[in-house]
Amino acid sequence: MSSFLNFNMNKEMKSYLLGFLFSSLLTTLPFLLAIEKFFCSEVNYIIFLLCAISQIIIHFVYFLHLSFDPEERWNLITLLFVIIIIFIVVFGSIWIMFNLNHNTM
């Protein structure tokens, strides 16, 4: 019984638990703000955006274990490449759809 009370979590488990707590908080905060309407809608949008960006960063740090260590530089370069490709695909598709709509109207 005493080993249960004095258990020692490793560093990875602490990271996952802390990330889960932060992401849970950053998920419930926008829901509460949307339901209770504490602020005007413009302030809520800004808070939602900040919560979303911080949750992305928390997922990268605590769950994907991305850091700025020299050993993990390739992971960051790969992530940057993926973000650029997604940006090109999404905004290229929007641009094509806008031009198609403009040319057909």
Curated annotation (Swiss-Prot):
Subunit structure as annotated in this protein's UniProt entry:
Heterooctamer of two A chains, two B chains, two C chains and two D chains.
Q: Got a GO cellular component term for this one?
A: plasma membrane
Q: Which NCBIfam families does the protein's record reference?
A: CyoD
Q: Name one Pfam family in it.
A: COX4_pro
The family note in this entry says: Belongs to the cytochrome c oxidase bacterial subunit 4 family.
Q: What does this protein do?
A: Cytochrome bo(3) ubiquinol terminal oxidase is the component of the aerobic respiratory chain of E.coli that predominates when cells are grown at high aeration. Has proton pump activity across the membrane in addition to electron transfer, pumping 2 protons/electron.
Where is it located?
A: Cell membrane
Against InterPro entries, the record matches this protein to: Cyt_c_oxidase_su4_prok, Cyt_o_ubiqinol_oxidase_su4, Cytochrome_c_oxidase_bac_sub4
What domain of life is recorded for the organism?
A: Bacteria
Could you list the residue ranges that cross the membrane?
15-35, 46-66, 76-96
Could you list which ranges are Extracellular topological domains?
36-45, 97-105
Q: Which protein are we looking at? A: Cytochrome bo(3) ubiquinol oxidase subunit 4
Task: Indicate whether Transmembrane helix appears among the record's keywords.
Answer: yes
Molecular function (GO) terms listed? cytochrome bo3 ubiquinol oxidase activity; proton transmembrane transporter activity
Q: Which UniProt keywords apply?
A: Cell membrane, Electron transport, Membrane, Oxidoreductase, Transmembrane, Transmembrane helix, Transport
Q: In this UniProt entry, which residues form the Cytoplasmic topological domain(s)?
A: 1-14, 67-75
Q: What is its main location?
A: membrane
User: Tell me, which GO biological process terms does this entry list?
Assistant: aerobic electron transport chain; electron transport coupled proton transport
- Name of the gene: cyoD
Please give the organism.
Buchnera aphidicola subsp. Acyrthosiphon pisum (strain APS)
The record gives the membrane topology as: Multi-pass membrane protein
